[in-house]
């Protein structure tokens, strides 16, 4: 082998070593760039869910609640559609309650694995709202917690909705009490139903 060929082989080997050394750093830089683009909203990561993911999710199972449902943990074993409200419920709130009832009915045999909950920061509902819920929403659970306790949930929901330039309509909570997704006026019943059917299909029945 000539001296020129030997030098070529040496440089080729060095080049391969340099490439092997650079690959991990290149991947780290690429991952960092992609992460920053996703976080800034410049690119999106495709997913099956229709709702807006709450990141990170908010744990509600330890939330001190006064509830119309007699249970140690009202979240356990069921996917819950949460309508956040107060002493009164405006027309938008009433429409959301109606939508949640329609979705619940359309789940058919899977309806027993889901529930609806009106989560209020008022210790008592107005007489008109109480009468309306009693007449129109027999299977709705009503729960109360004070505003400071609900603040982490409210802040997470607001941030999630505002990031999409939307207004939150209701929240989906998993069977372990994690607030997972937010739905806004952009989501119709079909979108919510699609998410719920997918989640019920791939989650264990309790």
Predicted regions, residues:
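Structural beta-sheet core signal
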Residues: 81-83, 116-119, 172
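Thiol-/selenol-based redox modules, centered on thioredoxin-like
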Residues: 165-206
